[in-house]
Amino acid sequence: MKKLLYLGLLSVCVLLGSCVEKNVFNAFDKVERYMDVYSDSALLLLEQIPHPEKLRGKQRADYVLLLTQARDKNYLDSMQSDSLIKLAVDYYKNGGDNVKAGKALFYYGKVMDLQGNDTLAMQAYLNALAKLEKTEEYKLQGLAYEYIGILNADRKLHKDALDNYQSSVYCFQKAADTLGVIYAYRDIARIYYVEQQYDSVYNYINRALSLCEEKKGCIDFERVTPSLLQVKGIAKRNEGDLENAIILLKTAVETEQDRHSMHHCSMSLGNIYLNQNKLDEAKRYFTLALKSERPRTLAGAYHYLYLLEKRQKKYAMALYFKEKSDSLLSVDLDAKQASQILTLQRKYEKGKLLLEKQQVEHEKKIQFYFGMVIVLFIILL
């Protein structure tokens, strides 16, 4: 009778475990369906899963991958922690699911990028592409190429960046991802802007704007339009077409939803007015940039206000703005140096742990060989 009772209880536990596992996977399926269209709902569903710390194996890996993806799509700073996504990378790296392995590596690359570790970010993106190249995940391949291009552009490797962006366009086109194509066109235009090839800038920006026009009324396409106008506007400014530059940059400032981009655009516009000696208009747009929360942007705004006050021979105010600008640049430099020191410290700690591990293994080998000698000595006796 007791045996039957134990078997019954065991069966109930197995069934309950099976139901819980099934419910979790059902929740994951729903999250994946929501991710691209309703990313906020996807994040909410993940946060409602009870006791995620108790998940193990595939469930744990799937959970942290989806959570990292949802946080990224909702622009949350909590994505900057690499401890979660590393679990997914380690789980999938030797498995047969190249899509999830590639996706985990891609998001690990983004986390490394946010932490300022360009080398690890680049390696992660390249490893992601290696996993994805035989799959049909063209959109993810396009994103990986785009982020590799951004890293190369930051390193002034413009030719490499252009090649990466062109590969990105090809992948987005295969994925029928028009928005991805638009962002890649903008990236290409920015490279040509740096190279001062303005005809090519206008070519790619106009192609991107035409695609936006085809999707008029769609919020994602309306969101990218101001940044396209900004690139075109500063190119017009550099060519001396100030009338069209002002029209384009004004429209960009008025329609830009991203505050950081809007503040940069307002400084570009203010600089044109400063050079035209339209000081009231210049001050208006420089002051707008003072609402930024980023030290480097604020430093730029204060620097332009310093130039403006200096031109009006208001030296006391000019000196005040100059000191504010220098102070913010110093804070930004200190933060970068602190980040570099932290990176070096982590490398040192990792190297130290590796050395300790090697020493332990060496001691184990010595103990093993010593034991063998003792055994042989006893046998020979």
Indicate residue ranges for each PLM-predicted region:
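Residue signature of alpha-solenoid helical repeat architecture, marking inter-repeat boundaries
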Residues: 21, 56-61, 99, 139, ...
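Amphipathic alpha-helical segments of tetratricopeptide repeats
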Residues: 47-52, 86-93, 127-136, 167-171, ...
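TPR-repeat structural position
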Residues: 39, 77-78, 98, 118, ...
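Hydrophobic positions within repeat-based interaction scaffolds
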Residues: 25-43, 51, 79-82, 280, ...
